[in-house]
Amino acid sequence: MPIIQVHLLEGRSGEQKKKLVSEMTGAVCSSLDVVPEQVRIILSEMSPEDYSVGGTLFSDKKK
């Protein structure tokens, strides 16, 4: 049973997330030869204040 965890910044629409998990599930099924019911995907959203790139909060980089 593959389990995939995806970390992403908040703000994506429900439709974008549906498309992401659908396409990821398809890719996992074809590459690992499993059925969709075996694939688990965890989406973890975070705010720009909780993410850093190069020592700078992402929320500060957008300014």
Task: For each feature predicted by the language model, list its residue ranges.
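A domain-level signal for the structural core that forms small-molecule/cofactor-binding pockets
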Residues: 2-63
